[in-house]
Amino acid sequence: MLSTMSPRLSLLLLWLLLLINAAHPVGALPRLCDVRRVLLEERAECLRELSEEKKALGPKTASGCERFWDNMSCWPSSALAQTVEVPCPKFLRMFSGRNGSLFRNCTKDGWSETFPRPDLACGVNMNGSFNERRHAYLLKLKVMYTVGYSSSLAMLLVALSILCSFRRLHCTRNYIHMHLFVSFILRALSNFIKDAVLFPADDVTYCDAHRAGCKLVMIFFQYCIMANYAWLLVEGLYLHTLLAISFFSERKCLQAFVLFGWGSPAIFVALWAVTRHFLEDFGCWDINSNASIWWVIRGPVILSIVINFIFFINILRILMRKLRTQETRGNETHHYKRLAKSTLLLIPLFGIHYIVFAFSPEGAMEVQLFFELALGSFQGLVVAVLYCFLNGELEVQKKWRQWHLQEFPLRPVALSNSFSNATNGPTHSTKAGTSEQSRSIPGANVI
């Protein structure tokens, strides 16, 4: 007896899952057209195999249960009194990312009902109240990261313009900062472009007219994300090198850093795109149901986070040792305050907060989304403020220009080294020239 529950259940699952999908901000759930296409492809493949089996049998009648399509899965032919196992339907794995199995018995009356229930076996939540709460949560999250990326984008553009405009600020350290700013800008822009492509008003546009363009957008998005992590790692590597190595060529290192920061992400993203094309080519490539393929990108990102965290710990150890040699015993409170300030300055520059959820379980996904999207979207804003707008030398330059224009409106503005040397802002001095060889570090003025 064929199951009469399967078609209704499949439609119910689709309806409930698509309610969640309508508000998902990061493109982790498929569109209805993607699900429909997967179902049609699997149905066509199942019917083709059934036709070939019938041709092979000829006029003979097969005993047992023949292959059939139940609107969710393709069940292979089976002998009587056998239990057949098939994996969870592909469209359910697209939503849940969970691998499971469904079973049917071949009886003298035909196929039995499916067991266990597909929603339970395949990890699909059928709780309507939970879905509504998640829907509202994801909407709020989307608003938060849109505000975060917008504010970060505006501040980063201004900060980048400032660093590019002042020739006195052109040094290896600030060149690295500028590349980091550009990576944050690209990350924000790629998020806006991705949302515009993945969530248009018309599903047909998404599914048919711009399928190739949509995949290119996702390739660009993944590249921008990886490039941002790469430049966070470059910041950590550069500062660690300043403290750990006495002499090295900063100019040659800058060339290597640029090649690594922009080149290494391209290699991994290209490998991911080729793998997706041949092994998981459905939808807009915004769904990562195959964990093995996703690790082509996730693996290097987690590795960069771990390496940067190791740099962070070692840098703090070196700073603590240096401070202990400089401080007197009676000034322990001041010593710890300066170390705390240095630590807080390094956290956004290195992206240390990412280590919290680098190895998070699936159950912590919503909390991880909050930290990485809602709070992480403001990281560019924080970095721009700390390493540009609160920069000590920039503060003096602005005040000096204002005073000079008021007192001598017809004379050109010239900044002497005495003003630069007198700076004592909340972050490190960014003066170029011989000061680079002094191995000053971010936050040196507050240590």
Swiss-Prot record:
Domain of life from the UniProt record: Eukaryota
Biological processes, Gene Ontology terms: adenylate cyclase-activating G protein-coupled receptor signaling pathway; cell surface receptor signaling pathway; diet induced thermogenesis; intracellular water homeostasis; positive regulation of lipid catabolic process; regulation of appetite; regulation of synaptic plasticity; renal water absorption
Gene: Sctr
Family membership noted in the UniProt record: Belongs to the G-protein coupled receptor 2 family.
Keyword Disulfide bond: yes
Lineage summary: Eukaryota, Metazoa, Chordata, Craniata, Vertebrata
Annotated tissue distribution: In brain, expressed in the hippocampal CA1 region, the lower layer of cerebral cortex, the anterior olfactory nuclei, the anterior ventrolateral thalamus, the lateral region of hypothalamus, substantia nigra, tegmental area and central nucleus of the inferior colliculus, the ventral supramamillary nucleus and the cerebellum. Expressed in brown adipocytes: expression predominates in mature brown adipocytes (at protein level).
This protein's name: Secretin receptor
Pfam families the record matches: 7tm_2, HRM
Sorted UniProt keywords: Cell membrane, Disulfide bond, G-protein coupled receptor, Glycoprotein, Membrane, Phosphoprotein, Receptor, Signal, Transducer, Transmembrane, Transmembrane helix
UniProt topology in membrane: Multi-pass membrane protein
Signal peptide: 1-28
Extracellular compartment residues: 29-140, 195-215, 276-290, 356-366
Disulfide bond sites: 46-74, 65-106, 88-122, 214-284
